[in-house]
Amino acid sequence: MTNVIEARGIEKVFHNGDEETRVLKGIDLTLGQGELAAMVGASGSGKSTLLSIIGLLLRPTAGTLSISGERVDDLSERMRARFRNQRLGFVFQFHHLLPDFTAMENVAFPAAAPGGGISRAMRTRARDLLARVGLEDRIDFPAARLSGGQKQRVAIARALMNRPDLIIADEPTGNLDRESADRVLDLMREVNREEGATFLICTHDDGVAARCGRRLTLSDGRLTSNVRDPGGFS
Ligand code: ADP
Ligand code: MG
């Protein structure tokens, strides 16, 4: 089976004037299809930087990256953007929904061709996904009128719209109270189990990490631990 992520020797150095910050110092990471993995680490340890590199939003200073068996680190910007839109899904701490558009439109829009409308098939899939995340009664609500947890459910439905190979979630529960955070994580577990979606979730919440199938720890620019079934019950 092809691995969804194969990263080898990933390094990242940021330059600000004369100052150099070495954030990632050689990351090797393999993630198989259907995994639900959490990455934990102190604030500033480089979690978002690594997710941005894997999400093709940022290029590594060194190292190689393959997603679903395809080398992506040396692609042109245009091909990287295309790969990102077609093969990856994103969930961020701040959902970035369009407040005046409905839940359905927020899920379907990113899948529409630039300048194109939402096709009937996209509408149907967006509605199905919103039902899947428990929002069948909020499909036509403007995003601004949804609660924080509901908005994050819309963001998950949106991430699933293109049937991505990998869903990258950066602190998806960071802005939610305990109960909403648990429900959002339950939903990701369900989508993982029932649809085989592969997740890489970065979180500073140990409660979230304990309920993922694998916990990776990032410390001082290196992956220092890799524990399968950290909660001991999946
Ligand atoms: P985390 O998500 O684990 O909190 P980040 O990946 O956001 O950590 O940041 C890791 C380190 O890299 C921090 O010291 C941060 O200041 C630095 N950093 C992140 N992005 C940039 C940037 N664009 N330019 C310079 N330094 C950056
Ligand atoms: Mg971060």
Curated annotation (Swiss-Prot):
The ABC transporter domain, residue ranges: 5-231
Chief localization: membrane
Residues at which ATP binds: 41-48
Membrane topology: Peripheral membrane protein
Entry GO MF terms: ATP binding; ATP hydrolysis activity; transmembrane transporter activity
Keyword presence, Translocase: yes
Gene3D superfamilies linked to this entry: P-loop containing nucleotide triphosphate hydrolases
Enzyme kind, highest EC tier: translocase
Protein name: Lipoprotein-releasing system ATP-binding protein LolD 1
Gene name of this polypeptide: lolD1
